[in-house]
Amino acid sequence: MKSIILFVLSLLLILEKQAAVMGQKGGSKGQLSSGSSRFPHRHRSQHYSGQKDKQHTESKGSFSIQHTYHVDANDHDRTRKSQQYYLNAQHKTTKSKQHLRRRQRLLNYKQKGRGRVKPKRHFHLIVIHRKGGQVHHGTQNPSQDQGNSPSGKGIFRQYSNTEERLWFRGLSKEQASASGAQKGRTQGGSQTNYVLQTEELVANKQQNKQQRETQNSHRNKGHYQNVFEVREEHSSKLQTSLHPAHQHRLQHGYKDIFTTQNELLVYNKNQHQTKNLNQDQEHGQKAHKGSYQSSSTEERQPNHEENSVQKGVPKGSISIQTEEKIYGKSQNQVTIPSQDQEHGHKENKISYQSSSAEERRLNSGEKGIQKGVPKGSISIQTEEKIYGKSQNQVTIPSQDQEHGHKENKISYQSSSAEERRLNSGEKGIQKGVPKGSISIQTEEKIYGKSQNQVTIPSQDQEHGHKENKISYQSSSTEERRLNSGEKGIQRGVSKGSISIQTEEKIHGKSQNQVAIPSQDQEHGHKENKISYQSSSAEERQLNSGEKGIQKGVSKGSISIQTEEKIYGKSQNQVTIPSQDQEHGHKENKIAYQSSSTEERQLNYGGKSIQKDVSQSSLSFQTEKLVEGKSQIQTPNPNQGQWSGQNAKGNSGKSADREQDLLSHEQEGRYQQEFSGAHNTVNIEHEVAYDDLLTQQYNEDRNPVST
């Protein structure tokens, strides 16, 4: 094998010298195509200037020939003859046709047995670009067993850049074809006189080449992306060499069309990308985005189409089930972390301690249906619907005792939170009736779509909780940012807990949220933004109108019901925190001691109607008039006992405030109540949908394209 490598090296040196001599002659033969007389000079500039100049010549696109050669010991004589044919331009066309057929037969034979041979084969795909600045991507069978094999590449590095890159083309052909992208070969392929020998074969062999490469692309289409994704993670050099030029065209199915023939070649359609996740239990994983400690988190950013189905619900382990479907596709995710006791957990983005969270960013629709309620574990049920798709999420963290939890963004201590950012509609239907726990049920509908979320954390005792953004101590919160309308229907009946039900409607849509944290004793709680101690809060930022209808009747607790109407829409929110004993509460923004607060930021004026039916609590009814809307405030405070509240910007004894943080209007309501004597809260919610006319009107204004 070593002798073969040295032989190929000497052959390449001879051919390079001959190409340089012919370049000095100036291309006086005259039979070359337009721009090919400058080929040897550009050829030499590509040798010593790296991929930047290669991409530059790609953008120029001054050539119109593509041909594939197989170089080994058996090919020596034919290669030398083809060089002689190039020197004798009159015989070049007829003689090289025969060699082209022989090389194609040899190439097809090598492609059939390629996956079963040792990974030291040297296929060189030489590509010359056609005029017009576009590149045709040649296709060969990817060898999945070769991987990142560095066979022979170090030997050629000892000689020259030219041979190194040419050898690298032969080496990385599998990686390049695995991604469907011949970026490496296209950028560095036109380096030897193999190309010069076939420059006048365009009119005769182009159609056969197109058909041949189309067949290869259809044959290899199933596992381009999969092999490329695996190898991409293990080699930064391959990322730099394979990623730059035309990866986006491959992922989105762009079309490369040859104009030298009457028959057009449409290439690279319907590329599929498949990602499979291993079902493992991971501990102590340090990453920039997600941290796993006997838990599971998944953040998915699909580009076009993904289908992954995994099943596994073990006891005391992590199970991830994922099926993503965009544009009529479906996705399921089940996350079940085990029952552990964790201390001192710190990460950058999302931290799990016997809890579960999911942050999803989607470009287009996903659909997922999941069912999983284990004992003493966390189950995430997700159904997202965009453009007629649906998603459900159920989060049930286990019952643990956790201490010293610190993170930057979202912290869970036997609780659950979800931050969702969606571009278009979602649909989800969830039902959760826990005992002594937290239940968040949410249904979002955008352009006639809906979503439900159920979050049920357990009852824990937590101490020393500190974070930057959102802190949970046996409580629940949800921060939602949506671009367009939401619709939700929720029902939640819990015992001795907090229930928040919210229905937001934008452009005739509605949403409901139910948050039911448990009854705990918490000490020393400090954070930067929002702090919960056996309470519940919700911060919502919406672009346009909201509609919500809520009903809440609680005993010995605080009930806030809010209806905001923007552009003829309304919203109701009910917040009922539980009765706890809390000490030493300090935060920067909002402090709760057995109380509830809602901060709303809206772009336009709103209408708010609140109704309270509770014992020993505060009731406020507010109606503001902004831009043709009215507002009425009716304070109806009750007698309460307050002690030990220290908050920056908020402190009161039987008092309430309102903060306006809006461009036009923002309503914040504070209701405070002493620690009551009842532990049972029964809530039944009935939510009415909007009428069909509004939905059809909005769908007519916003047509859905599948």
UniProtKB/Swiss-Prot annotation:
<dbReference type="GO" id="GO:1901318">
    <property type="term" value="P:negative regulation of flagellated sperm motility"/>
</dbReference>
<keyword id="KW-0732">Signal</keyword>
<feature type="compositionally biased region" description="Basic and acidic residues">
    <location>
        <begin position="654"/>
        <end position="670"/>
    </location>
</feature>
<feature type="signal peptide">
    <location>
        <begin position="1"/>
        <end position="23"/>
    </location>
</feature>
<comment type="subunit">
    <text>Interacts with SERPINA5.</text>
</comment>
<feature type="compositionally biased region" description="Basic and acidic residues">
    <location>
        <begin position="460"/>
        <end position="469"/>
    </location>
</feature>
<dbReference type="GO" id="GO:0048240">
    <property type="term" value="P:sperm capacitation"/>
</dbReference>
<feature type="compositionally biased region" description="Polar residues">
    <location>
        <begin position="509"/>
        <end position="519"/>
    </location>
</feature>
<dbReference type="InterPro" id="IPR008836">
    <property type="entry name" value="Semenogelin"/>
</dbReference>
<feature type="compositionally biased region" description="Polar residues">
    <location>
        <begin position="449"/>
        <end position="459"/>
    </location>
</feature>
<feature type="compositionally biased region" description="Polar residues">
    <location>
        <begin position="137"/>
        <end position="151"/>
    </location>
</feature>
<feature type="compositionally biased region" description="Basic and acidic residues">
    <location>
        <begin position="520"/>
        <end position="529"/>
    </location>
</feature>
<dbReference type="Pfam" id="PF05474">
    <property type="entry name" value="Semenogelin"/>
</dbReference>
<feature type="compositionally biased region" description="Basic and acidic residues">
    <location>
        <begin position="297"/>
        <end position="308"/>
    </location>
</feature>
<feature type="compositionally biased region" description="Basic and acidic residues">
    <location>
        <begin position="400"/>
        <end position="409"/>
    </location>
</feature>
<feature type="compositionally biased region" description="Polar residues">
    <location>
        <begin position="611"/>
        <end position="622"/>
    </location>
</feature>
<feature type="compositionally biased region" description="Basic and acidic residues">
    <location>
        <begin position="50"/>
        <end position="59"/>
    </location>
</feature>
<feature type="compositionally biased region" description="Basic and acidic residues">
    <location>
        <begin position="580"/>
        <end position="589"/>
    </location>
</feature>
<feature type="region of interest" description="Disordered">
    <location>
        <begin position="276"/>
        <end position="678"/>
    </location>
</feature>
<feature type="compositionally biased region" description="Polar residues">
    <location>
        <begin position="389"/>
        <end position="399"/>
    </location>
</feature>
<feature type="compositionally biased region" description="Basic and acidic residues">
    <location>
        <begin position="340"/>
        <end position="349"/>
    </location>
</feature>
<feature type="compositionally biased region" description="Polar residues">
    <location>
        <begin position="630"/>
        <end position="653"/>
    </location>
</feature>
<feature type="compositionally biased region" description="Polar residues">
    <location>
        <begin position="569"/>
        <end position="579"/>
    </location>
</feature>
<protein>
    <recommendedName>
        <fullName>Semenogelin-2</fullName>
    </recommendedName>
</protein>
<feature type="region of interest" description="Disordered">
    <location>
        <begin position="25"/>
        <end position="62"/>
    </location>
</feature>
<keyword id="KW-0964">Secreted</keyword>
<dbReference type="GO" id="GO:0050817">
    <property type="term" value="P:coagulation"/>
</dbReference>
<feature type="compositionally biased region" description="Polar residues">
    <location>
        <begin position="329"/>
        <end position="339"/>
    </location>
</feature>
<dbReference type="GO" id="GO:0005576">
    <property type="term" value="C:extracellular region"/>
</dbReference>
<feature type="region of interest" description="Disordered">
    <location>
        <begin position="131"/>
        <end position="156"/>
    </location>
</feature>
<comment type="similarity">
    <text>Belongs to the semenogelin family.</text>
</comment>
<keyword id="KW-0677">Repeat</keyword>
<comment type="function">
    <text>Participates in the formation of a gel matrix (sperm coagulum) entrapping the accessory gland secretions and ejaculated spermatozoa.</text>
</comment>
